[in-house]
Amino acid sequence: PGDRLELTVYWYAEATPEYGYNSFVHVAAGGPPVAQADKLNPAGRPTKEWTDAGYILDPYVIRLPEDLPAGEYTLTVGLYTCETLPVGECGNGDRLQVFDEQGTAVGDMVPLTTIQVR
């Protein structure tokens, strides 16, 4: 509890995205996030400028709450846009869907790993 969690997400665009996306990393234990980081321009670059030229490194620092109970937490990452929604109604945004190798939609965020808080 109270520690900083540092990680780097590697994004890879197969084509230039149609919309400008925000990125998020959530720390959760089966419910709403207990800590998170959101970025307007992942890796400091608008996603509309991403090309298929390789991986994009996107570093994050998340401060875990001082009163965070001990336990196991899952880190998830995803992208969302507000461009497809009415002005002022972004909320969680319109999240980009995640697909498995067979092309089946499996949700709107990718689990990265679990961490143990002591």
Regions found by a protein language model. Name each.
Residues P1-R118:
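C-terminal luminal/periplasmic domains and tails of membrane-associated envelope-modifying transferases
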